[in-house]
Amino acid sequence: SEMCIRDRKDIQEDVETLHSKAFDPLGLSTDTTLDSSGAHKMRSGKEEHLYNPQTIHLLQLATRTGDYKTFKEYTALVNKEEGVKNLRGLMNIKFPKKGISIDEVESVDSIVRRFKTGAMSYGSISREAHETMAIAMNMLHGKSNSGEGGEDIDRLKVGPDGLNRCSAIKQVASGRFGVTSRYLVSAQEIQIKMAQGAKPGEGGHLPGKKVYPWIAKTRLSTPGVALISPPPHHDIYSIEDLAQLIYDLKNANKNARISVKLVSEAGVGTVASGVAKAGAQVILISGYDGGTGAAPRSSIHNAGLPWELGLAEAHQTLTMNGLRNKVVIETDGKLMSGRDVAIAAMLGAEEFGFATAPLVTMGCVMMRVCNLDTCPVGVATQNPELRKRFTGKPEYVVNFMRFIAQELREIMADLGIKTLDELVGRTDLLEQKNVAKSGRSAEIDLSQILDNPYVKQTKIHYDKKNVFDFELEKTVDEKILLKKFESAMETGSKRSLEIDVANTDRTLGTLLGAEITRRFDDKLDDDTYTVKCNGAGGQSFGAFIPKGLTLELVGDSNDYFGKGLSGGKLIVYPPTGSTYKEDENIIIGNVALYGATSGKAFINGVAGERFCVRNSGATAVVEGTGDHGCEYMTGGTVVVLGKTGKNFAAGMSGGIAYVLDEDTSLYKRVNKQLVSMEAVSNKYDVLELKQLITEHVAYTNSKKGKEILDNFGEYLPKFKKIMPHDYKKMLNMIVQMEEKGLSSEQAQIEAFYAATK
């Protein structure tokens, strides 16, 4: 209770100090101008930062000259004991009297394979910065992370110059930007981002002025229109849903490790245990010091916890539940030195992510304008003129990673430890040091982190023989589809097949689709391979299927139908003799076509909630939808031949929806914040609508579709065209630029500049 009172007194004093600076209740003419404390942007003589002019200069000098001695000067400043800035600053490493020769320690080349660069999207940082990190990490056989913004197709294979610009880790975030079959197949590791260290609970946000045409092309969105990822993944509302997404992604690339990114928080150990049971091979515990570039300041300074807390809890909880040797634990969040990595390993980490430090080696000077597109060194900007100032090279990032590994080896040699695996979980080599005589630091107790009852267990790191078994050999794809289509894929000839399915056949068609992508990219003609399925489709039917593959389902399907559709075609209709009315028969479940990027879907029945959420480019025809249809949509075309649920088109910033409004009540159910609702009058719109309904009837034999086509003149006035304001404005501007004689590409650029001035 005494400690509690003292803590409250500290807090009270802080509040009173700030209050007295902001108010003058007695009218004493006190200057209430608030001076900058330097908490966010560094100010001379104010709050100290680990990245300051001195450390930034030394780090850049060391990595650009390849001088390890200068790097040691940098880490000496970072690790100095005065003014503790993080929890690891309160820890001592307990060295024995005698270590071992550094020649006996695991090599630099081996250690750097455990290093990764953090998830920074192409869009938040420049192409030059993004590619430089990818090249560097591929040179080291480590891994770079694409972030959530997709990746240009020309980077997915080794370039003509022999450089590999492909990010080994492909991230799948709630926005699903650029998540295609090709994107997933190119990955060595696929990371599901549940949250971000600096802003847990918030979705990603790319301001409109950073959505240049080339970014919009990669993300399949509209230039100049801000991109906001939903706060949750709409296919993850429970741990079972997460297990389903992990399974989907394993089917989309059976050779990739599946990783789940969590944020350090109280209780993260319980979540990590669930994630391990769900089949993830890597669990990332992200600290609050990371990912601060464009996060809101309120989140940067008030949300998240240090990685030391979450990492220790996750490691101990997984060990306690007998799950530790099934997964790799990774951590990130301002790892700056070999000492930081050593302590992270002792607390339970086996792999390590770096983000800010590689940016600094490439030229970042911590101007804190990442979200403004005004980065003066060409790192966090898309502005072509500012990008010319980029001076980074892959060699600088390589030097940084190798220097970190070398410093780590020196610590391991002094500890008498030969391999990094032997260091994992060795909290007995750490102790709390008493550097603070007063203030809150003096009250900190690290015993829950350091007193690990499982520390004497030697096998407390990942062992590949314990990896989760997805039993893919039992899937319909492996047992039937891949075998039946093998000869056709070898020759590129057309082939069709008819099979029976049950709702236990999850993620049907995805393994086959991934193999088609590996062999043909997206170059096949439509309907090259067709599978007619009779029965009930399971979860994630047709997820991520590519161009050339058609799945025709006579029956119904569960949730996540057509998730991430990547050019394939999906057709669903009830069996002959069905007595249900199509516009009253819910034939597919919730969250269909989530994150679809291209392809077509024709559904002779009603879809559940969140139909086409985050659709980026697919075309779909359906006979009705549940609530929140077309939510967060950025591209593509949707035709609804019946009623929608409430909140239709919420967050929709691109694409077009045509909705049949027979009782003129649609206006009550549309979220009008971002969209307009108008009659279908443009001749091109009329032609498009009629063509899509014609295709729908041809594929599904829809009675409603036939009736509309037979009486098209009568039904046309009942259709409403729903289109986002900004999307419409941008398309009109592009047309105006093209009328001036500009090419399509140049017209987009000029329209973007005109819209974002």
Regions found by a protein language model. Give the residues of each.
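Short, small-residue-biased leader/transition segments that mark boundaries at the very start
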Residues: 2-5
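Mobile "lid/hinge" segments at catalytic clefts and subdomain interfaces of large enzymes
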Residues: 7, 186, 191-223, 348-442, ...
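Generic recognition of stable, solvent-exposed alpha-helical segments in well-folded globular domains
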Residues: 10, 50-54, 66-69, 110, ...
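Terminal or standalone catalytic/regulatory effector modules within metabolic enzymes
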Residues: 10-168, 227, 426-434, 439-558, ...
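Generic, well-ordered alpha-helical scaffold segments in large soluble proteins
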Residues: 77, 118, 132-143, 245-252, ...
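Glycine- and acidic
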Residues: 111-123, 224-233, 251-258, 292-301, ...
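Alpha/beta enzyme core
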Residues: 179-332, 337-367, 373-381, 514, ...
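Long, distal/terminal scaffolding or interaction modules
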Residues: 386-387, 398, 411-415, 424-427, ...
